[in-house]
Amino acid sequence: MSQPFFQFKQFTVWHDKCAMKVGTDGVLLGAWTPVESSARILDIGTGTGLVALMLAQRCSASVIALEIDGTAAQQAAENITRSPWGSRIEVVCQDFRLYSNKNNSLKYDTIVSNPPYFTDSLKCPDSQRNTARHNDNLSYEELLKGVSNLLSPNGTFTVVIPMDASDSFKDIASSQGLYPSRQLLVITKPGAPPKRTLISFTFIKQDCKEEKLLTEVSRHRYSDEYIKLTREFYLKM
């Protein structure tokens, strides 16, 4: 049985009640997202609260951690309460579509999401895990429409998605007036094609700066660039 919690340098994330556990995608999103000058941050689909906690560690912004699943929201709230930043992070248990419609007068400097990514794969009997993994609960179109309503004029939206969804996601984003400014191609082992990508979007059309990140040089041996990006979080970096 896997550990029921993951220990970081400044906080602990319990994930035994959450469908999706602490993983590389969330850590990369929390470490790579630009948060300079952010006063208000929205984390869509916070799960365990990992990304919200990482962003709170990196800046002094107030953070809304939004989660549709009640059990996950409760565990996120517990993780956040135990952290040094409990007073700056609020967990809201609500469907993002409802939240974006009711709160479109609120604007966020930074919005992040590690959205569900399976579109047509077979589902498992666990409804909580299906919600966390399958995007029929929140499509990319619905996600990006809501983001365009809530993002401040000079704000940044950063997302982690499968590499094969990158082009279609950018097309949908552009239909909502959002354009890529930075893109990170994540390579898990030398010589392999990227399977994940992180993209930052703004309302400003510009050249997109593309970067590559190799996470491991061999099994359980992290690359220097991955260590540099995540050393403020992982215990043994």
Swiss-Prot record:
Its EC number(s): 2.1.1.223
Alphabetized InterPro entries for the sequence: DNA_methylase_N6_adenine_CS (IPR002052), SAM-dependent_MTases_sf (IPR029063), Small_mtfrase_dom (IPR007848), tRNA_Adenine-N(6)_MTase (IPR050210), tRNA_adenine-N6_MeTrfase (IPR022882)
UniProt-recorded Gene Ontology molecular function terms: nucleic acid binding; tRNA (adenine-N6)-methyltransferase activity
Keywords (A to Z) from UniProt: Cytoplasm, Methyltransferase, S-adenosyl-L-methionine, Transferase, tRNA processing
PROSITE patterns recorded: N6_MTASE
Catalysis: reaction(s): adenosine(37) in tRNA1(Val) + S-adenosyl-L-methionine = N(6)-methyladenosine(37) in tRNA1(Val) + S-adenosyl-L-homocysteine + H(+)
SUPFAM superfamilies: S-adenosyl-L-methionine-dependent methyltransferases (SSF53335)
Xref: Gene3D superfamilies: Vaccinia Virus protein VP39
Cytoplasm as UniProt keyword: yes
Subcellular locations according to the entry: Cytoplasm
GO BP terms: methylation; tRNA processing
GO cellular component, as recorded: cytoplasm
HAMAP family: tRNA_methyltr_YfiC
Function: Specifically methylates the adenine in position 37 of tRNA(1)(Val) (anticodon cmo5UAC).
Family, as annotated: Belongs to the methyltransferase superfamily. tRNA (adenine-N(6)-)-methyltransferase family.
Name this polypeptide is given: tRNA1(Val) (adenine(37)-N6)-methyltransferase
Source organism of the structure: Bacteroides fragilis (strain ATCC 25285 / DSM 2151 / CCUG 4856 / JCM 11019 / LMG 10263 / NCTC 9343 / Onslow / VPI 2553 / EN-2)
